[in-house]
Amino acid sequence: AHAAWKDAESDFIGILRMWNALQPFRDERGKWRRNALRKFSTASYLNMRRVIEWSNVVDELADAESAHLKRGSGKDAAEIAYPYASIHRSLLAGVPRQFGLWDRENKAYRSASGGFFAVFPGSGLFAAPKRWEWVVAMELVETSRLWARRMARIDPEWVEQVAPHLCRSVYGEARWDEAQGAVYGKERVVCGGLAVVMGRRVHYGRVDAKLAHGVFVREGLLGGGLRKRGKFLDFIDELREEVGTIEDKLRRPAGVWDEDAVVAYCEERIPQEV
């Protein structure tokens, strides 16, 4: 009887569908038509008393929201179009550690703590045509194995948005970008044992100014990555040519010129703000 409300992406959308299916059994004042509700509940294997208790909680929350925001309750819940992302970011904020990444080898979801959990057979996601890569689980119940109940597909970047205090960033691959005239790198955001953001492009000067300055000198200034050449670079080229001539005479190719020393010389004299 509940199969009509199930959703392959989210058990919470299934709950919302159930709620919306109950709304026609209210009168124009919002009161329940109990006889009709009782028949529907019996046919749908729902507990009418629990339905009414659920309704009371929803009404109390709506009143509290209206009082807090100092506005009317607005549209009836059944009339509102609920954005998937907004609903599930809110749910994820309540259980920010209870998310997982599908592990094909183990055929289960790897959790942020390093363990594994499986989709509970009663979930709408159990019979879904595909396994969603990332999910949140509102309930984790351990019996013969750790089962996830009340699940939903999520975007891993939502973890960083709702729980930045649980995330840490790892940076690398700093490179000079000639088109942008700056040093850029890659950011990886990790929560627990799972990377929720991979390869996000970042301005490296805001991450590690000293390292970015070194990349600028080596790749941008001395590596020919600048759009405009200054007289200083002409001097360096002339000096490199002169040293090359000396190396040829001494039969010591690349034995006199020290690129690292030149880089260190430039780093010492060019301010990091440049």
Task: Map each language-model feature to its residues.
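Second RecA-like catalytic domain
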Residues: 1-182, 210, 214, 236-264, ...
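GHKL/Bergerat-fold ATPase module
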Residues: 174-239, 244
